[in-house]
Amino acid sequence: MNNKKILILGAAESGVGAAVLAQKQGFEVFVSDNGKIKDNYRKMLIEKKIPFEEGTHEGAAKLIAPLNPPLRGDLAQSSNVALPQSPPEGDLGGLEIIKSPVIPDNVPLLVNAREKGIPIISEIEFAGRYTDAKKICITGSNGKTTTAMLTYHILKNAGLNVSLAGNVGKSFALQVAEENFEYYVLEISSFQLDGMYDFRADVAIITNITPDHLDRYDNNFQNYVNSKFRILQNQTKDDYFIFWSGDEVICKEIEKREVKANLLPFDLEETDDTFAFTKGDQLIFKQIVLSAITGKSEKQQITKSTNNQINNNQQTNQPYMTMELENIAIKGVHNLYNSMAAGLAAQVVNIQSDKIRRALETFDGVEHRMEYVASVRGVRYINDSKATNVNSTWYALESMQTTVVLILGGEDKGNDYAEIADLVRKKVRTLIFLGKDNEKLKKFFANFENKEQGTKNKDSLSATNNKIKIIETKSMQEAVDAAYEVAKHGDTVLLSPCCASFDLFKDYEDRGRQFKECVIKL
């Protein structure tokens, strides 16, 4: 039995997975969840004989601040189920906390632990200690789920022994405990990165960085940026960093930091530095001279020159792969960026070009991300519930070729709606606010006027200069019913909320499912 004790805060996918892995590694484990544990996770804890509590953090607090006499009776009394085995004793020696990413760092329990010098880490950090698999890690403000799932799709269809984990798919820790994969594609949020210290990404991807979750970062954008760049913190000269070179925030951060990994930028336009770009109607990937990650061939040195510009030594101009843009399965400029990032990651792990091309042509997309639901009375309904920040909604609106009825709102995260103001004026007929508190939205969008230029539907806004209609709703059914009433033939009803979902829904998935259910019933 390992002498270290593991306290896990949060008994959902990541927490229970971490508990199973910790138990397998011989640690004493105790799981604490302040809410109600879902039946499937409770069943797993009981079957594995892992002690836990729910509806309280009382037991967890006692482990952090040990009391006498021993805690078993107190813990069992505070739990909603009998403990299958004794919880860890209240000795701080060797205690480590693995916390759910949804728990803020400033809750008193964690503040107390930090003051006592108790390490607090994420499930990703913990699981990374116990696998030698190659890890392709994706973060960013937008596009990380699509990029992760597309990368997984390419690798899986190429025959690699690969799994999907992190912020999507099954728990990384549970898979490390029970499976033996050679590759992991990990979507990693900023909250997960905040609890990562020694974890090393063999391939790191940052899709983009725009303001998001600022309420968790003291409303300081640089704090959020620093969190995203933690994905690079332990990379070496044998690793790779894939990024969009059109993102000014990312490029400025690269100039400020010592990035040891090979740099693989991509953009719409070709430069001397880009490894993926478009030319006419073609998507083009340049050849990468592979490094130690695949053990195949001589490493390509890609470094920064003294003037902080990206400098590619030994770069070949020979194309690795080309394909017609119209054959890429997922549409829109944002998905073109996602395809470039995933394609470069696949090339790094030595996937043949024809397999990358075929996978890009067959990927079905991600549920709740620009997902087509149905057409009713000549109106298309699109579910973009995963758009929980302004930049995501910007990309959604930018891709629209018709007049839009836009459903937005929810739990504001310090949003600056000015980023979508021009697109709203050009493309939106009606704004439908969906949330408990719509005051910030109403104040910003009051008196907006249509200035549409060139939509394809026959009832174009360009003939008028009308004030954009605003409708307030408090449920998804109300929002969909309102959209049905105001949308005209040829319009698109777009659910792209800009905001978190927790004011009215369990999560963005619940919000998206309710939208689809309401649309199907029209």
Model-flagged regions — what are they?
Residues 28-35, 241-245, 407-408, 427-436:
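Short internal beta-strands
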Residues 56-59, 178-216, 252-308, 312-325, ...:
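Extended acidic/charged loop-beta regions that coordinate divalent cations
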